[in-house]
Amino acid sequence: MDWWDQALSMEHELYGFLPWPRVERAVFDAQISAGWMHSGYPFMAHDLSVPGVVNVSQMAEEGDWGMFHELGHNHQWMPSTLPGTTETGCNFASVHLMEDLVGISGHGAIIPEQRDSRTRSYFENGANISDWSVWVALETFLMVKEEWSWSAITTALSVYYDLPASEVPYTGEEKFNSWVLHLSNSTGMNLAPYHAAWGLPLDQSTFDSLDHLPVWVDDPLRGDYFEYPAILRGLHSPSISGTNSTNLSWETYDNGTNITLTVFYGESDGGLQQSAWSNSIVHGSTDVGDDYIEITGLSCCGTDYYARIRASNDAGETWFGPVTWSTDYSDD
């Protein structure tokens, strides 16, 4: 029983509902109400499982993914259970206990080759949220766990237990947005672009609420599975530039994947059509932080100019701007 006490304590701590209010009970029988095992109070399993679960040596060496999984169900909280993840969130317990208590991966579905193959297939097929469930969805959480440990997920889950009624998410869309907000705040990073890459339907208000946090720009999807767009902010030129030049500046908030920046400028705004611009400069790649480019060869003496920046990669392009300025009448 000491071994199972430890296992259950680890599950309680993982899901963050402490102190756990009850003793978990299990019933083993020749005929149960559904399946091989099922969650509930009591948790139920067939009597063929009894020899293993009372053999502490076997449990310590092999664990029992299914037992951990069903007991994980008993810890799920519906407001934090995203659409498609009923059979995912309970596997947090299975992964955690198999790895950190037993010391093995415990399931063929989470060996590196299977994880890579499943993730690659998901993104090659368009990263549709309708396909985001069970093992694919688990991968989304595992990548976060491997960057920040389970504690980030525990902290986010714990928020839900004390939410005022007005903030409890009910619809699928509310749950997706709420989770990304709480998990981002837990990690201290903006995880909206990461979850949007997986296909989660996020509102613009979620992106806006997190734009004070740095973007997770080295997540495992980047380059290998998904090409992110860049996000530039604060595109600026002095309203009165030099006689024949100006410095165009901006903040690269997210440098995306394999991004090339091109600056388009001219005496009229060409919009989002490359062919409508009279001049362009290829700036190339950009790093997170402040950046700029000097534009020279401008006409002097009060000539009005417009500029936009295009950030492009093989996945598409995003335009930023416009910004406007007028050239000075003298070098003074």
PLM ranges: what are they?
Residues 172-229:
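Beta/coil-rich, acidic/histidine-enriched accessory regions frequently appended to metallopeptidases
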Residues 229-238:
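Proline-enriched interdomain boundary motifs that mark the N-terminal boundary
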Residues 315-332:
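Extracellular fibronectin type III
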Residues 244-256:
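Conserved aromatic anchor
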Residues 260-301, 314-318:
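Recognizes extended acidic, P/S/T-rich segments that occur
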Residues 1-146, 154-157:
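Catalytic cores of extracellular degradative/oxidative enzymes
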